[in-house]
């Protein structure tokens, strides 16, 4: 059964497999009406590709060019406090154009070791979200239901989010039946040496994976959760969607988070 979600199809056509953003549902191949100013104060986009002034001018009009700078020839520095004109469409164009040659595949990491760094300032949030994965699969109106059921049976069910440098964070994944819920730990890069990442058996029915950072470290993000599948595409869940409509039986994802001060999202 082929996944016909327009977002998944567009990503596959471009060679992408996963895109992660903080706090918003901006997608790099789609244009949204809202701006990204509520999520970002400043953006620094870094790549192995060498940006040029001509490239900058091709992306931005002169009226917002004053907000754009180069960082030692290695990236683009966008100070959103200097412009009111940077929309999600511009952000989409940055990502699609800037990395189309240097990174043909995007799966929480660029395969050619390029990196994208979104610097974020003044993030203060405390969040405790619970996503149980039950009712969604029982919705007969959802045409992707069987795809996800099959992926769960095959063990290709993963949960991933953005990466966030924060003062403190704890995430806990539980599953009743061993093998149902997987966390793709291999995609997490640059973990602090003293970060805790362990799997625990609680009694005879629960398998628990706990990820906890030290006082500061690169950890999972909290505002955007993406469920993705190795073969059949991507399902995106964010704050604008109904968290009570969920995937799977006897499965739950619990995020216990405490994020303070400024940080940055890093995909490496």
From Swiss-Prot:
Entry comment on modification after translation: Palmitoylation helps stabilize the inactive state; may self-palmitoylate. Palmitoylation is not required for permeabilization of liposomes by the ring-like pores in vitro. Palmitoylation plays a significant role in pore formation.
Cellular component, GO annotation: cytoplasm; plasma membrane
Keyword terms of this UniProt record: Antiviral defense, Cell inner membrane, Cell membrane, Cytoplasm, Lipoprotein, Membrane, Palmitate, Transmembrane, Transmembrane beta strand
Site (Cleavage): 247-248
Keyword Cell membrane in annotation: yes
Transmembrane segments: 78-94, 103-121, 168-185, 195-211
Domain remark text: The N-terminus has marked structural similarity to the mammalian gasdermin N-terminal domain. The C-terminal region wraps around the twisted beta sheet core, probably stabilizing the inactive state. The C-terminal region can assume multiple conformations. The beta-stranded transmembrane 'fingers' of the active protein form by local refolding of several alpha helices found only in the inactive state. Reorientation of the N-terminus probably flips the palmitoyl moiety for insertion into the membrane.
Protein's recorded name: Gasdermin bGSDM
